């Protein structure tokens, strides 16, 4: 670029506006007044340095050589094909592999010495490189020598082992040959003469290497020089010349080759036939045989005797399970039972005696299995609980009739509002809570009061220490009140009566005391031993007196429990949570339940993953009389099941599986009996009884049990409620398919169907109904069942006429002159002719006249003439009934 370059020309060269170039020059510290001024080379370099510094680059003069980059990034892409198994087919997928490597050049100060000349530096580098190459070559040579020595030692070791194996094999063959020779000599001593010349060692080696006696008894052989009449051939064996038949020869050959597979035996037989016999086999074939024998490959061995199995059978067992234990097909087992005169299917159960008989018939042995092995071990675990009993909190169950204020009373004690959250304002689950009061800790169980929850109330009374019977002062004693008294009396639990709702104007506590006298519940003021407390859950009056009464009763009972050791208790309620899995609400009765314990709960087991109390906190452990929620079980246990903590998971699993097997056997026996009862019932009732299939899913186990019992109780002679499946949790796809197959109505109690289940239900038109109150479930099922019953035809008498005289007509025959004594007689309705209150004819009117005029009806106390169609035997004194048929909807 010349020295006469102006700012305008420089702007054109660098493709930059003149104003921007002037700003950049000013930023570099050079002042120019206009675009026509000349820019020198020094000023250009100064501007370039400024721009480099501005953009993060070093200030390097234009004339210097550009430095090599200090960091280089290399990208590489490779395409590969990967074969992926997709079921039975294989799919090839293209995979692109991307690699990125970055190389950083270290500063020159690390490997350059500035004081040395460039030529000396290059020589030193070359010498260093040569030295490193020589060291690498020496290392590689030493490694190759070491590997060669290792290979040589390995080959020598293999050769030594091979020689030892050959020597051992040779010794074994010599021993076998000597033993077989002695056996043959002993067996054939009566019919075979030994040759005077002993067999040579070479002859012995030429014999087959493996000779084994046949399983069956060896037939006697006779000596002969020529082929005998049975087609035998001459064989030389162990120094004896014997004549062996073709059958014996094949059997002996098979006995010598039983250790081989079928393919090897066929190949060896073809080699033997092609070369004229086993004594002329080549050395190569013998070597192959040695290699096959030494490889350890074991072929099928034909059993020499029948296999007798000894199995353990409990009190009952299904036909399929017994066949599996005896390694038989289920069809063969059923066939054997049919031959014994027992008509069963593979799913039916048979008792122990029948299992013994059929097993002995098939050649096997049966012993009685102890069905309580693991239960005994579990009992030993529970009996090992030692410790000093200490006082424990009382467990109090609140019972009473529905809507008498049980949950409201508990809400006031706990300072909560549970009753507001209950559907319909009624309790439908067992609620378990523990409350810290000034008088100590008290555990409360709130039970439902509806009639359908009888089993739930009985379960609450079973595990409680004190029953608080809540009776509304304005309502008095009701059916569930009496039932609660019976539950408490059956469980032997003391009773405290809480007369609630005394704040109402219609309250009459004295009436409650008098009505309970009929149930043998006598108040203390009447000379009895039952405490009566009048209270109001709305105002709180009398609640403290109730807590005092509970504390006094607990002191009298002297409740104690061992708080250390393995925990035992009872399942109060259980459910299936979508996010947490099976959840069981348990009440600890002995010991301490901790996180991480293994426990058996009915037919389920598991490890405690977490503990939750009623407010959602996670305690580390639960002491006696404290209810907690347990997570980690293998399934949803039944409410009322006992739980026990064990040492290891193996015992827990064994006990749970044994209990499940017992329950399964019991269920099969029960179902078989029910099937027979159903068949007999159908035979007796004919086909008039309708069947309503139901599939019930509920949120908790207790509600599910109550629903099933309440709905099955609706069955009668006209309709049968058949519950095909019950379960805890949401309605799934399998539930929907079951409902489609059995044409059942699906009932969801506080649960909903998932997306896949809803799709199946909509496509197939399944009747799905959601409920949250048990009253509504029972009412809706009654309506559906009534719809299945159809209508009933009833006959209603609308009029009665008395025959006063009989006239003869050429057109109608006998015409009865009648007086209507009751109701109305209509021409369009059917009639009956009664004589001495006995029906003698049933038909219809042919003519109804009054004063020779046809009329449609004749009312009470009016005379008329009646012509009966196709009946001429009407007599004076007969009665003619006129009736109509009406349809009436049938209900449960």
UniProtKB/Swiss-Prot annotation:
Organism encoding this protein: Xylella fastidiosa (strain Temecula1 / ATCC 700964)
Q: Where is the signal peptide?
A: none
> Which terms does the record give in the GO molecular function aspect?
GTP binding; GTPase activity; guanosine tetraphosphate binding; translation initiation factor activity
* Bias (Basic and acidic residues) ranges: 138-185
Q: Which residues bind GTP?
A: 400-407, 446-450, 500-503
Summarizing the function annotation, the protein's role is:
One of the essential components for the initiation of protein synthesis. Protects formylmethionyl-tRNA from spontaneous hydrolysis and promotes its binding to the 30S ribosomal subunits. Also involved in the hydrolysis of GTP during the formation of the 70S ribosomal complex.
Give the family, as the similarity comment puts it: Belongs to the TRAFAC class translation factor GTPase superfamily. Classic translation factor GTPase family. IF-2 subfamily.
Question: Where does it localize?
Answer: Cytoplasm
Give positions of region: Disordered: 138-250, 262-298
Gene3D superfamilies from the UniProt entry: P-loop containing nucleotide triphosphate hydrolases, Putative DNA-binding domain, N-terminal subdomain of bacterial translation initiation factor IF2, Translation factors, Translation initiation factor IF- 2, domain 3
The protein here is known as Translation initiation factor IF-2
The keyword Cytoplasm belongs to this UniProt entry's keyword annotation: yes
Name the InterPro entries on file.
Answer: DNA-bd_dom_put_sf, EF-G-like_DII, EFTu-like_2, IF2_assoc_dom_bac, IF2_II, IF2_N, P-loop_NTPase, Small_GTP-bd
Q: Show where the tr-type G domain sits.
A: 391-560
The reply to whether Nucleotide-binding figures as a keyword in the UniProt entry is yes
Q: Where is the composition biased (Low complexity)?
A: 207-219
**Record key words, sorted:** Cytoplasm, GTP-binding, Initiation factor, Nucleotide-binding, Protein biosynthesis
Which Pfam families does the annotation name?
EF-G_D2, GTP_EFTU, GTP_EFTU_D2, IF-2, IF2_assoc, IF2_N
Q: Name one GO cellular component term.
A: cytosol
């Amino acid at each position: 670029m010349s020295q006469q370059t102006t700012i305008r020309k420089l702007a054109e060269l660098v493709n930059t506006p003149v104003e921007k170039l002037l700003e950049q020059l000013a930023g570099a510290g050079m002042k120019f007044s206009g675009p026509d001024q000349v820019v020198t080379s020094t000023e250009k370099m100064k501007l370039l340095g400024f721009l480099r510094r501005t953009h993060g680059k070093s200030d390097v003069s234009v004339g210097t050589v550009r430095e090599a980059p200090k960091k280089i990034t290399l990208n590489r892409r490779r395409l590969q094909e990967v074969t992926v198994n997709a079921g039975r087919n294989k799919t090839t997928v293209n995979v692109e592999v991307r690699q990125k490597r970055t190389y950083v050049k270290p500063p020159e100060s690390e490997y350059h010495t500035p004081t040395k000349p460039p030529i000396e530096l290059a020589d030193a580098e070359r010498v260093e490189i040569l030295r490193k190459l020589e060291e690498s070559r020496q290392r590689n040579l030493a490694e190759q020598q070491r590997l060669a020595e290792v290979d040589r030692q390995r080959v020598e070791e293999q050769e030594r082992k091979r020689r030892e194996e050959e020597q051992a094999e040779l010794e074994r063959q010599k021993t076998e040959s000597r033993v077989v020779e002695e056996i043959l000599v002993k067996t054939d001593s009566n019919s075979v003469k030994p040759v005077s010349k002993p067999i040579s060692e070479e002859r012995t080696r030429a014999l087959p290497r493996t000779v084994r006696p046949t399983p069956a008894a060896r037939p006697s052989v006779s000596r002969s020089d020529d082929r005998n009449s049975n087609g035998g051939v001459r064989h030389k064996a162990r120094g004896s010349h014997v004549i062996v038949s073709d059958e014996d020869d094949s059997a002996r050959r098979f006995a010598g080759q039983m250790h081989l597979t079928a393919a090897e035996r066929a190949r060896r037989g073809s080699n033997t036939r092609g070369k004229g016999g086993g004594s002329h086999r080549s050395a190569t074939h013998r070597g192959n045989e040695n290699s096959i024998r030494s490889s350890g490959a074991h072929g099928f061995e034909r059993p020499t005797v029948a296999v007798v199995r000894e199995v353990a059978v409990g009190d009952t067992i299904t036909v399929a399970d017994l066949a599996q234990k005896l390694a038989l097909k289920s069809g063969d087992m059923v066939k054997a039972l049919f031959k014994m005169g027992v008509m069963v299917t593979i799913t039916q159960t048979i008792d122990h005696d029948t299992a013994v008989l059929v097993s002995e018939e098939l050649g096997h042995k049966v012993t009685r299995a102890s069905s309580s092995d693991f239960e005994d071990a579990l009992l030993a675990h529970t009996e090992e609980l030692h410790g000093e009993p200490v006082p424990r909190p009382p467990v109090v169950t609140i019972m009473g009739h529905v809507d008498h204020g049980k949950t409201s009373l508990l809400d006031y004690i706990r300072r909560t509002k549970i009753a507001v959250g209950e559907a319909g304002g009624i309790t439908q689950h067992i609620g378990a809570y523990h409350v810290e009061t000034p008088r100590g800790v008290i555990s409360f169980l709130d039970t439902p009061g509806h009639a359908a929850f009888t089993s739930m109330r009985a379960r609450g009374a079973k595990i409680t220490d004190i029953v608080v019977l809540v009776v509304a002062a304005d309502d008095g004693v009701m059916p569930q009140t009496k039932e609660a008294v019976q539950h408490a009396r059956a469980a032997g639990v003391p009773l405290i009566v809480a007369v609630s709702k005394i704040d109402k104007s219609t309250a009459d506590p004295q009436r409650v005391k008098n009505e309970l006298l009929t149930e043998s519940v006598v108040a203390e003021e009447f000379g009895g031993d039952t405490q009566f407390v009048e209270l109001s859950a709305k105002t709180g009056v009398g609640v403290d007196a109730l807590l005092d009464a509970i504390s006094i009763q607990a002191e009298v009972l002297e409740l104690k429990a061992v708080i250390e050791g393995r925990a035992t208790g009872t399942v109060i309620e259980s459910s299936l949570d979508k996010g947490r899995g099976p959840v069981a609400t348990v009440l600890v009765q002995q010991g301490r339940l901790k996180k991480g314990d293994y426990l058996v709960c009915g037919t389920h087991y598991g490890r405690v993953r977490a503990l939750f109390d009623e407010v959602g906190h996670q305690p580390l452990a639960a002491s006696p009389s404290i209810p907690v929620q347990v997570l980690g079980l293998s399934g949803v246990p039944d409410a009322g099941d006992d739980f026990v903590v064990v040492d290891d998971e193996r015992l827990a699993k064994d006990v749970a599986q044994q209990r499940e097997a017992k329950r399964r056997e019991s269920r099969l026996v029960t179902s078989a009996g029910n099937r027979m009862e159903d068949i007999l019932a159908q035979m007796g009732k004919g086909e008039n009884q309708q069947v309503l299939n139901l599939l019930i899913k509920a949120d908790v186990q207790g509600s599910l049990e109550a629903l099933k019992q309440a709905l099955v109780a609706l069955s009668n002679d006209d309709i049968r409620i058949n519950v095909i499946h019950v379960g805890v949790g949401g309605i799934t796809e399998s539930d929907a398919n079951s409902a489609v197959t059995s044409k059942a109505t699906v009932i969801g109690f506080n649960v909903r169907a998932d997306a896949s289940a809803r799709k199946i239900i909509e496509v197939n038109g399944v009747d799905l109904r959601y409920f949250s109150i048990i009253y509504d479930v029972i009412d809706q099922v009654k309506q559906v069942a009534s719809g299945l019953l159809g209508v009933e035809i009833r006959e209603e008498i609308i009029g009665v006429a008395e025959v006063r005289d009989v006239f003869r007509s050429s057109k109608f025959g006998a015409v009865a002159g009648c007086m209507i004594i009751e109701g109305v007689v209509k021409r369009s309705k059917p009639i009956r002719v009664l004589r001495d209150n006995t029906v003698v004819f049933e038909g219809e009117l042919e003519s109804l006249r009054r004063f020779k005029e046809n009329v449609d009806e004749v009312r009470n106390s009016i005379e008329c003439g009646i012509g009966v169609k196709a009946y001429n035997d009407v007599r004076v004194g007969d009665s003619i009934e006129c009736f109509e048929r009406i349809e009436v909807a049938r209900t449960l």
